[in-house]
Design a protein with these regions (language model features):
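A helix-centric hydrophobic-segment signal that preferentially recognizes long
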Residues: 1-184
């Protein structure tokens, strides 16, 4: 009888260890999948940018510095390797795209162009997908980080070779500036 109790306790402990280990592995895989989705959406956006730049260039030939800023930001965004680098490059690219779209506002013929409108619509859709992917990634990173930091799964994190992950945070300098309000 004692041997059955010992075997049952050992079996329960083994099941507990295995379930904690598998939970951490599943969370880690989910974070990897979420990161892959961000990369897919950022690639899609990067692929749209050359067409958008060429379309705007046809109407606004003297806006070379804006075009150069977009191309440079796109290059950095496509070569970033870490979460922090990707987030920084993404913020820079977003700023450059805002500049490009501001240039487009000055050209009514461009704004009326079917090609430009289609590209702008695709870009807006892609931006929404990027935002959703970022949120999905950060939600999964939060779940993983919580599991890695809390007992009992924190005891198994090292064994499972799972560690905390960085959140995807885009710092947009424009979001920090307080707008000037004048009632004059």
């Amino acid at each position: 009888m004692e041997i059955i109790i010992v075997v049952a306790v050992v079996a329960l402990i083994a099941v507990f260890f295995i379930s904690q280990y598998n939970r951490l592995i599943r969370l880690n895989i989910t974070v990897d999948e979420a990161w892959a989705q961000i990369e897919v959406q950022l690639k899609r956006r990067a692929d749209l940018i050359p067409n958008l730049v060429e379309t705007v260039k046809g109407y606004a030939k003297h806006e070379q510095s804006t075009f150069d800023a977009v191309v440079t930001a796109r290059e950095k965004a496509t070569t970033a390797s870490t979460v922090a680098d990707t987030a920084a490059a993404d913020g820079m690219l977003t700023q450059a795209l805002r500049g490009l779209l501001a240039v487009a506002e000055a050209y009514p013929d461009l704004k009326a162009s079917a090609n430009f409108m289609s590209l702008q619509e695709e870009l807006a859709t892609t931006e929404n997908k990027v935002a959703f992917s970022r949120q999905f990634y950060n939600d999964n990173v939060r779940s993983l980080n919580t599991a890695v930091k809390t007992i009992p799964s924190s005891f198994f994190a090292g064994f499972a070779k799972v560690s905390e992950r960085e959140f995807y945070e885009v710092e947009d300098p424009q979001d920090r500036n307080v707008p000037n309000v004048s009632f004059n």
